């Protein structure tokens, strides 16, 4: 049994398979997941697990070069936006329209669905390198 890091076998496998610039998405329970993209559904009830809890665990185990968010999060969920900025200090941040965000999810290696039920609590993590 693993002693630390991501314990979920599906998430751990996706993280291990990422190459430079590959993307994964951590999503609230309402984000549409495109056909053909791997769905890792962690939602057990409204709010559990939370978006921020899942983001923290994944971010601790992943080299992140860039973060993409829907620009609507700035006004409609300022608290989550602030938390993301505090948790992910080093990567570059990119804000796009929610429609553009959803289009970008079609290229993701996986989408991790949380139980989060607040608006625009979604992030695309772009893999960096560890060297």
Curated annotation (Swiss-Prot):
GO terms for biological process: D-ribose catabolic process. It is found in: Cytoplasm. Pfam families: RbsD_FucU (PF05025). The keyword Cytoplasm applies. It catalyses: beta-D-ribopyranose = beta-D-ribofuranose. The active site is at 20 (proton donor). GO terms for cellular component: cytosol. One of its GO terms (molecular function) is intramolecular lyase activity. Keywords: Carbohydrate metabolism, Cytoplasm, Isomerase. The keyword Isomerase applies. Homodecamer. NCBIfam families: PRK11797.1 (NF008761). Belongs to the RbsD / FucU family. RbsD subfamily. HAMAP family: D_rib_pyranase. This is D-ribose pyranase. It comes from Bacillus cereus (strain B4264). The gene is rbsD.
């Amino acid at each position: 049994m693993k002693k630390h890091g991501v314990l979920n076998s599906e998430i751990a496998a996706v993280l291990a398979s990422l190459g430079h610039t590959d993307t994964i998405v951590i999503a609230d329970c309402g984000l549409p997941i495109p056909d053909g993209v791997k769905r890792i559904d962690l939602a057990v009830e409204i709010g559990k697990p939370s978006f921020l809890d899942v983001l923290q665990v994944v971010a601790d185990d992943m080299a992140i070069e860039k973060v993409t968010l829907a620009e609507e999060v700035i006004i409609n969920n300022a608290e989550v936006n602030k938390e993301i900025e505090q948790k992910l200090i080093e990567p570059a941040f990119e804000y796009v329209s929610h429609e553009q965000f959803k289009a970008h999810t079609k290229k993701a290696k996986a989408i991790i669905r949380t139980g989060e039920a607040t608006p625009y609590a979604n992030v695309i993590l772009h893999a960096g390198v560890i060297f």
